[in-house]
Design a protein with these regions (language model features):
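Catalytic histidine-centered segment of alpha/beta-hydrolase-like enzymes
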Residues: 334-345
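N-terminal cap/lid segment of alpha/beta-hydrolase-fold proteins
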Residues: 22-67
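Short glycine-enriched nucleophile-adjacent loop
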Residues: 185-196, 202
Length: 379
């Protein structure tokens, strides 16, 4: 288990010391940096830091033990860092801010290799991309300086553990709720299966799950191969547009805001060609055996038009998990990027009800449709 050192947090837009009574409804952004001894294969044993963002109402920021069961940690997926995925600076599209305004203390963590967390040095060399992805970054295709696994699912679980323990100590709570997206499903779900005593509730949008995954899937690594990838604006738009299945599903202005925040989260990638987002190639995943022992109350949401994590795969996860409290939501007019689309508030409100009451539309166990003509529940 990695060792953590808790550091001084930085607060924006106002200093905690200057808070006054009339500031209590102001929403704060607080940056935390958690020092760890890394277990990431590329930098194992070296000091590293994890970026943890906090959104909280100013009135609760100084009361370290006032939140009780209202402490949440967001965990991102394979490509987009947490502060972009869950706290995008566009209208009311920040999932973190939505929950914070409802009285939660809301945190997110960037895994090693993402956002403002430590990025292993090989990520700074475009030669470590696949040769067909190097164009525009180097004059001619080049051999990799590093062709091995950067991170692993096991090191991701250690990153989640470091963040969970940091938040538990900061807020004096035994358990936190986890909210994740996409490949954050294996990260958060796998962690919850291993540490149920530290997880109160689990919510995952588009949880990546493979019922046929090998029993040793959690131990799989890249070996020799391409350690990282990039995403350009063209890639980003094309992937989203192929998942549009209804009129006005998302706003171009929202897409622009997401991409602006994406480049801001990766200052080095922003200088490569027209600007790209860099990420490690994710290796390993959770296993069906882990899912079958997962007893934490679990809300899973699937966008009706998701072409990255097919809704049927999420239904398989619903069937496989052990929890007696589980809800599957089929979200209308939504893609893999549902939190940035027109039905985002349906998603956010469902998550709030799950966190506060353990139900969605009053349902504790079952399958629901949201955003269609009317919500319907089936067992």
């Amino acid at each position: 288990m990695r060792r953590c050192v808790w550091l001084v947090a930085f607060v924006a837009p106002i200093a905690v010391a200057a808070l006054k009574a009339d500031d209590s409804d102001r929403l704060l952004t607080i940056d935390h940096y958690v020092r760890v001894t890394s277990t990431v294969p590329a930098i194992a044993g070296q000091p590293a830091q994890l970026y943890v963002r906090e959104r909280v109402l100013a009135g609760g920021a100084l009361r370290s033990s006032s939140f009780g069961d209202r402490v949440v940690l967001f965990v991102h997926g394979a490509g987009t860092p947490a502060e972009v995925a869950f706290d995008v600076s566009y209208q009311d599209y920040s999932w973190m801010a939505f929950l914070a305004r409802a009285g939660f203390d809301v945190f997110s963590v960037d895994m090693t290799g993402y956002g403002r967390s430590t990025r292993p040095a090989p990520m700074n060399d475009p030669c470590n991309l696949a040769k067909d992805r190097q164009a525009g970054f180097v004059p001619a295709p080049c051999a990799p300086s590093y062709a091995h696994t950067l991170t692993s699912i096991a090191s991701d679980w250690n990153d989640v553990e470091a963040a969970v323990n940091y938040v538990r100590a900061l807020r004096h709570v035994e358990r936190v709720s986890l909210v994740a997206w996409s490949r954050g499903g294996p990260r958060a779900g796998g962690y919850a299966a291993q540490h149920p005593e530290k997880v109160r509730r689990l919510i995952v949008l588009a949880p990546a799950y493979d019922r046929s995954a090998a029993a040793n899937a959690a131990e799989q690594t890249l070996g020799d191969g391409v350690p990282m990838n990039t995403q350009s604006r063209q890639d980003f738009d094309a992937n989203w547009d192929r998942q549009v299945g209804c009129t006005d599903q998302y706003e171009r202005a929202a897409s622009n805001a997401v991409w602006t925040d994406m480049l801001a989260s990766d200052p080095v990638g922003a200088t490569w060609g027209p600007g790209v987002r860099r990420a490690p190639e994710m290796t390993g995943t959770w296993t069906p055996a882990m899912a079958k022992k997962l007893a934490v109350p679990f809300l899973m949401v699937s966008g009706a038009h998701d072409k990255q994590v097919a809704p049927d795969r999420v239904r398989e996860l619903y069937a496989d998990i052990a929890s007696s409290e589980k809800v599957f939501v089929d979200l209308a007019c939504s893609s893999h990027n549902a939190m940035w689309e027109r039905n985002h508030l349906l998603l956010f409100r469902a998550s709030l009800e799950w966190l506060t009451q353990g139900t969605v539309n009053g349902t504790k166990t079952g399958m629901l449709k949201l955003g269609y003509d009317a919500p319907r529940a089936t067992q």
